[in-house]
Amino acid sequence: MKNKILVFDIGGSFIKFSLYFQDKFMTKGKVATPLDSLENLLIVLKQIHNQFIDECEGVAVSMPGIVDSVTGHMVHGGSLRYINDINMIEVFKKAFHLPVAIENDGKCAALGEVWRGSLQGIADGVVLVVGTGMGGGIIFQGKLLKGHHLSAGEFSFIRTNNEHADNVDYLLGMQGSSSVLAKTVAKAKGLPEDAITGERVFKLIEEGDHTVQKIFQEYCRNIATQIINLQTILDPQKFVIGGGISANPLLVATIKEELEKLYLHSILNFVRADIEQSKLGNEANLLGAIYNYMQSHHLEV
């Protein structure tokens, strides 16, 4: 692609950004995401844009929430609670005075895997992004499945228990959350909630901490159970596991182990899910946002 595109991956904690040109990320950076107001979010984005104002020819955005990527209308902004019922393409066009394309972050991850990652050449696939919640995207017959209400792939809202309907702890977004995993380990070790990181969880597992190993196995079993359900409903060729915690191969390896246990103890002959670790890591959303921009503006892919 000959155009220089500024790409933002706006998350609940950080905004990752890069200038993309000729199939390369020319520069990368990240800053904290303002969580108090849209005005402050735009101030931060404009400050980043000003660094590239003489080079940038368009803006690609990956962000949380329910978004119509064609019209730009956002029903809500997910973890960005100040975004509700607003056209974010128009907001960004006014801020940057450039062509803009936006898409949901989980769907961007799926598009990134289709374009440059583990779903290249795959007609039907599912991307699970393990992070603060459980995001992702669904590729059906080679195209991104958005759903009638633009909510396809919002895996965080899957219920894992038919009791306690008023308790969000039983949603997959909590059961599969890497931050909840860390807090659970901290509680089990008698430590403050914020005393354990994802990296520390893996370190404790490697050191042979049986308590943490058991917690991690249960965590992976919960994800494996939902993979079986999604395999039954969608029948994809492949699942790709992404998100920050997936950088450690132990996550996918343990999910596979727990899947095998579930298959072995079942009297039914399930179609076995094919699972792979994301090859793109933290670049999946950025690449997916670029891919969405090129498709939206009819540029050569």
Task: Cite the ranges covered by each PLM segment.
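A charged helix-plus-loop insertion that forms the helical arch/lid used to bind
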Residues: 73-85
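General beta-strand structural signal in soluble alpha/beta enzymes
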Residues: 100-106
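Short beta-strand segments
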Residues: 9, 60-64, 127-133
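Active-site glycine-centered loops adjacent to acidic/histidine catalytic or metal-binding residues
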Residues: 105, 131, 289
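A cytosolic small-molecule/anion-sensing beta-strand core signal
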Residues: 21, 63, 70, 140-141
